[in-house]
């Protein structure tokens, strides 16, 4: 989860867009129009331990040295409306190449629907909250991520579904997930594993903070879709 993509771009021969370079682009393979987005952020631990510099808080021992703060799970490339990438995506979804494609596929890193841990907190810029004692000394620095400001669920998902995208492919949580939205868009999460071990389902919960201003979903898909779970039933007729 590094901001520097130079090595990746040097190793792989990638399509290039005029605006996004090798970071986000679109290409046609036969009947498929593939749109690749640059949607990723700085991964930080969800731990609330005193020595943790995580997505929800700063390390206690660095409270008075802001130059050592991590500033939460910040986003590498803007994707919200008005950003360069969002405007490029709008243009691509309205292009002749996209509209004429039989199959419309979008690929990105961050999940849109998942049972995995990494969809929480919301994909939005962290909101810093500094707590002080009566003498003005910093006692805590924490970060909130308002769910209603999630750029992906609020802005990107409606845009993709309205444009007729049939499949959205992503990774990040290192498990296998499949969802289908009411309008028929398929959401598939996969990586180097073909199982759903570690999914936040039933007794397994995500590590989320309690007592914060925002509520962070510990079980299930935070954005309301039921998973289509893998089964061996079809093998038995």
Language model features: what each stretch is:
Residues 2-106, 111-237:
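Metal-dependent phosphoesterase/phosphodiesterase active-site architecture
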